[in-house]
A protein has these predicted regions:
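Basic, glycine-rich polyanion-binding accessory segments appended to enzymes
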Residues: 277-345, 349
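Local cysteine-cluster metal-coordination motifs and their immediate loop/turn environment
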Residues: 11-26
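Beta-strand-connecting loop/turn residues
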Residues: 15, 179, 252, 332-333
Length: 352
């Protein structure tokens, strides 16, 4: 039997409706009975892990919208599996934010909230299919802050311009009191409804415009004491997402539920309901070399950088990037410079 990782991701695929840019597996308009059955299956998987002595240092409830499921039952089964100081994060859609839910989450051990805001412009929010206004998102976040002092948001940049959209100003976040912010560049996924729109390619902002937006966002976030600790993530000191940081550091993680990914030693699984691959949709085994490469490349995305002593054949390429000002080095530790952050995908591709 496999050792159980200390990091757990649980996927809840149900959502209020498919967003225009989303190509992830998700299901909308599902009956309550089906959502309850899914929650019961998740709770049962946790009970089995508990019986095997599982102890998790980080737990992440992702989706979809986890709040559409019976989180009370899931959290009750999770409790015996938590280390004393475990980080337990839950993703919330602004329309799911209600005080009774937040009170239950807090009482059951949740200590971190990530809310998907996605845009600071009402016209763009409507076009995305997000179903709330910026003011509604702000009110929801302020309600979250009444219960949690560790709360952040997600944003997307690079979305097509929408009609006479209001100006997208990051400064609108000045009084929100966020402790964390994830900022992702739009990836036009073939399976998304956005990709099927006529002329969509011509309406996308150019790379330079997206880079300028990311630069402005980063400068603003740093002005309110959020530090960039990964390519797409900023946080107040001590408020970094421990779960994602563990994954980027190369630690193993177990993913439970439809569409969830796991990395357990050399095994990679998708859609498993247990550490031994119970019910998995996919299971594969990678080579030791590919395993090391994957874990090291994740580390390069963070401010901690990667230790090239684990992969000496990269040394020449890494030194080339140092000479170009894309990387900095201290011994065998290599880190992306601010310029390197802008072209991270190019750097990673050169090392694969």
């Amino acid at each position: 039997m496999a050792d159980i990782p200390r990091n757990l991701y649980m996927h809840f695929p149900f959502c209020r409706g498919k967003c225009s840019y989303c190509a992830l597996y998700s299901r909308g308009a599902v009956a309550l009975s089906e959502r309850k059955a899914y929650s019961a299956k998740m709770a049962d998987a946790l009970s089995k892990l508990s019986a095997r002595g599982a102890k998790f240092s980080t737990v992440y409830f992702g989706g979809g919208s986890p709040a559409l499921c019976d989180l009370d039952a899931v959290l009750s089964s999770l409790a015996p599996c938590l280390e004393i100081d475990a980080e337990v994060s839950v993703e919330l859609h602004p329309l799911d934010v209600k005080k009774p839910l937040l009170d239950m989450l807090r009482s059951e051990g949740v200590n971190r909230i990530s809310m998907g805001v996605e845009s600071l412009d009402n016209a763009t929010l409507r076009d995305m299919g997000r179903r709330y206004s910026l003011n509604e998102a702000k009110d929801a976040f302020f309600t979250v802050r009444e219960f949690f002092d560790n709360a952040g948001i997600d944003l997307i940049v690079g979305y097509p311009r929408v009609g006479n959209a209001e100006e997208w100003k990051i400064e609108k976040l000045a009084d929100w009191g966020i402790t964390h912010c994830s900022v992702y560049s739009l990836q036009l996924e073939e399976e998304s409804s956005l990709a099927s729109r006529e002329g969509i390619e011509s309406s996308l902002p150019g790379d330079d415009e997206v880079m300028d937006s990311l630069k402005n966002i980063g400068e603003f976030l740093e002005s309110i004491s959020l530090e960039r600790y990964e390519i797409s993530n900023w946080a107040r000191k001590g408020r970094e997402c421990r779960h994602n940081s563990a994954v980027w550091a190369g630690e193993d993680y177990l993913g439970l539920g439809t569409g969830a990914y796991s990395r357990v030693a050399l095994r990679r699984m998708r859609g498993a309901w247990g550490v031994d691959g119970e019910g998995a949709e996919e299971v594969s085994v990678v080579s030791e070399e590919d395993d090391i490469k994957e874990r090291l490349l994740f580390r390069l995305r963070t401010r901690k950088g990667l230790d090239a002593s684990f992969c000496p054949r990269w040394k020449e390429t890494l030194e080339k990037f140092v000479a170009e000002g894309v990387l900095s080095s201290a011994g065998d530790i290599y880190r992306l410079t601010p310029r390197g952050m802008e072209i991270c995908d190019y750097v990673l591709a050169a090392l694969v």
